[in-house]
Amino acid sequence: MIYSDKLKELREEKNITQQELSNILKIDNSLFAKHEKEYHIIPINHLNTLCNYFHVSFDYLFNLTDQVNYENALENIDSIKAGTRLKNWRKENKLTQEKLASMLNMARSALANYERGRNIIATPFLYTICTKYKVSADYLLGKIDELVDLK
């Protein structure tokens, strides 16, 4: 599971209902319930809203670290900065677009669009990169500027 256990735990700690969170995200309650159980994957922009609401990092929500949040983390995701970070990270790890796209089981053109900042990387692709290579989601998304050690 990518985030479902942590998300439910955060929601229950704050005594917040699924309905309240669905209102914050401006989505139907039944859709949020499916998101929380990971029947549907939550888009990055909604995860960012939840991370900001609960004052936690993506890395914490993805269970990549026990550190709840990062000092001086930005609230918003800049798609251009995120794309540049992804491209630079890929090159530093000596991966071609073709190789990374193949590993993620996606089209190379979709990866190119992420790297150009046309789209924010999809949640499952981000999670796969972060878990396989132990790289911070918050760093790749441009929310923090320093690489952190992950478990």
Residue ranges and their predicted role:
Residues 1-13, 69-92:
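A short, Lys/Arg-rich alpha-helix, primarily the initiator
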Residues 7, 41-44, 86, 97, ...:
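Short, structured motif recognition centered on aromatic/hydrophobic residues
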Residues 12, 23, 52, 91, ...:
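Alpha-helical residues within the helix-turn-helix
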Residues 15-34, 94-113:
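Short alpha-helical DNA-recognition segment
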Residues 20, 31, 41, 57-60, ...:
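Residues in the helix-turn-helix
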Residues 45-60, 124-139:
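DNA major-groove recognition helix of helix-turn-helix/homeodomain DNA-binding modules
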Residues 60-70, 139-150:
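Short amphipathic recognition helices of helix-turn-helix/homeodomain-type DNA-binding modules
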